[in-house]
Structure formats: structure tokens, C-alpha cells
């Protein structure tokens, strides 16, 4: 039976450190407001936003949950973000991805002040990450690294296959892995014979939001799987990851479950970024 890479102990360790810092900043009168902004009703974003707002309130932040309509114009979204950026009570802003079709992510992200951009969406901040000048990457990418560190997985020389090339996980995670001397392969929707790549991997990170894209027959024995995917079950009851847990678990040495894995850490990494952005 594979070792389960649980997110809760990782998140709990982070929360202990954050709690003291939050109380310190409260006494100093620093802003603790947090704007969680979603445009449309992408299922994974709805789930993530709910978890994030709840966790933020529990730790002592002052979360503001914002859901803009699917049909919102680019101008409307930008104006909302600019208003939040000018609000002195708001310490940080997180804009959930993906955005509805027709909205330009880069133009919209520029409306988030760099000092309040908790997920490195502003092109300037993102560019620093991709150039290797900053390790302050999007929170989910950092959560994967935090999990690997907690479970003492040495990335040096390992072949890591990342499934997905999004700006919030795949691309920045590849840079973070390279900084740890891993050999990284990034696969995506146009990759031919995905299994050819995953069968040679020491660590596979599925991160596309496609349930079952990774199955046990696509892994070599003893591989690790850190599942970033969040998908609503077909019956609408709960969530599942991108990896087919039932077939992967007997093959793996270690695997993160969904729910119960990276998600809990991602939430805490966002809250950590809120504190960092006030420094």
C-alpha cells in the first residue's frame, strides 16, 4: 500500500507559524483584509474559493468573497480589481483562474498591484518567477514544493513529469523544480503518448483538471504522485483529483489523495503570501 501524502499535517505546521504573525500584525494595526475574486462559476474555483475564505476567517484574516457574473466585461473586472487595490483595508488579492472565455488574463492581472498580488498573476511578478529571479511563485505551485519538502522527497536528479502548462501551476512549478536540480518534462493537451513520458518519471504531478488523466498503467513501480487536480464528481457529490487513485495507489510508493492532499496546503500558502506582501 502506498504512503499517503496528506496535506493537513503540512498545513498545520504552516498555520502555527502564521497564527502568531497574524496576531502581531493585528496589534500593529496592519491590514488583514483579503479579497478572493472569482469571475463566473468554474466548479473547481467555486470549491477553492469556499475553502480559502473559510480558512482565512479561521486564522484571523478578514476575507471578502467576491463572485462576478460570467458575462462580466473586461472593463468591469479591471475596475473591480483596481478598487480593491486602492482599498487600504485589503492586504492581498487573489483572482481565481480560469477566467471566462473572452477575458484577457494578462490585461486583467495588470490591474492587481504587485504588492497585493498573492498568486504572482501580475505579468511583472510572474516574469520574475519564470526567469528564475524569484521563487515567490503562484501558491499551488509552492504548495507542491512544500509537500515534497515535508515528506523529505529529494528532487535532485529526479525525473519529474508535470501534466499541465498553466500559468498558475505547470509553468511556474517547472521553474521551481529546476531550481532544485530536477529534470523536468512538461506535458500538455498536445503531447503525443503521455504514458511514454509518465512511465519514466520518478514523480508525476497531474495538474490539468481532468479526472482520470493519470492511471496506474502509466506509472513505473515506486513512482510518487502529487495530484493537483480538482474535479467535481460526476454525481456532484464531492471532488476527485486528476489521478485515478484506485489504479495508481497499488503502483506508487507515495500518492497524495484528493481531497486531503495539496488543496489544504495551497490554501495556507495563499494566507502566507498575504503576510509576505505586507512586508
Task: Spell out what each predicted region is.
Residues 76-88:
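Short, well-structured alpha-helical segments in soluble
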Residues 96-102, 210-212, 230-233, 261:
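Short glycine-rich anion-binding loops that position phosphate/pyrophosphate groups of nucleotides
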Residues 24-35, 40-58:
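N-terminal glycine-rich anion-binding loops that anchor highly charged ligand groups
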Residues 1-30:
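Positively charged, low-complexity intrinsically disordered leader regions
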Amino acid at each position: 500500500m502506498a504512503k499517503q501524502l496528506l496535506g493537513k499535517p503540512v498545513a498545520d505546521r504552516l498555520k502555527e507559524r502564521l497564527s502568531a504573525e497574524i496576531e502581531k500584525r493585528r496589534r500593529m494595526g496592519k491590514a488583514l483584509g483579503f479579497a478572493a475574486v472569482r469571475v463566473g462559476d468554474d466548479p473547481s474555483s467555486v470549491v477553492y474559493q469556499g475553502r480559502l475564505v473559510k480558512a482565512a476567517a479561521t486564522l484571523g484574516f478578514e476575507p471578502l468573497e467576491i463572485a462576478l457574473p460570467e458575462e462580466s466585461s473586461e472593463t468591469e473586472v479591471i475596475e473591480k480589481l483596481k478598487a480593491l487595490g486602492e482599498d487600504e483595508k485589503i492586504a492581498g488579492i487573489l483572482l481565481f483562474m480560469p477566467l471566462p472565455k473572452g477575458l484577457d488574463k494578462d490585461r486583467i492581472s495588470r490591474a492587481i498591484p504587485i504588492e497585493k498580488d498573492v498568486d504572482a498573476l501580475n505579468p511583472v511578478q510572474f516574469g520574475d518567477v519564470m526567469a528564475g529571479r524569484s521563487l515567490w511563485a503562484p501558491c499551488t505551485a509552492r504548495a507542491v514544493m512544500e509537500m515534497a519538502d515535508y515528506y523529505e522527497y529529494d528532487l535532485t536528479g529526479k525525473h519529474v513529469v508535470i501534466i499541465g502548462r498553466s500559468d498558475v501551476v505547470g509553468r511556474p512549478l517547472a521553474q521551481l523544480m529546476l531550481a532544485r536540480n530536477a529534470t523536468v518534462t512538461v506535458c500538455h493537451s498536445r503531447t503525443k503518448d503521455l504514458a511514454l513520458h509518465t512511465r519514466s518519471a520518478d514523480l508525476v504531478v497531474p495538474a490539468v483538471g481532468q479526472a482520470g488523466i493519470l492511471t496506474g498503467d502509466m506509472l513505473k513501480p515506486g513512482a510518487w504522485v502529487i495530484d493537483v487536480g480538482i474535479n467535481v464528481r460526476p454525481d456532484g457529490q464531492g471532488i476527485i483529483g486528476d489521478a485515478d487513485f484506485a489504479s495508481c495507489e497499488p503502483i506508487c510508493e507515495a500518492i497524495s489523495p484528493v481531497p486531503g492532499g495539496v488543496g489544504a496546503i495551497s490554501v495556507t500558502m495563499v494566507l502566507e503570501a498575504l503576510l509576505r506582501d505586507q512586508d
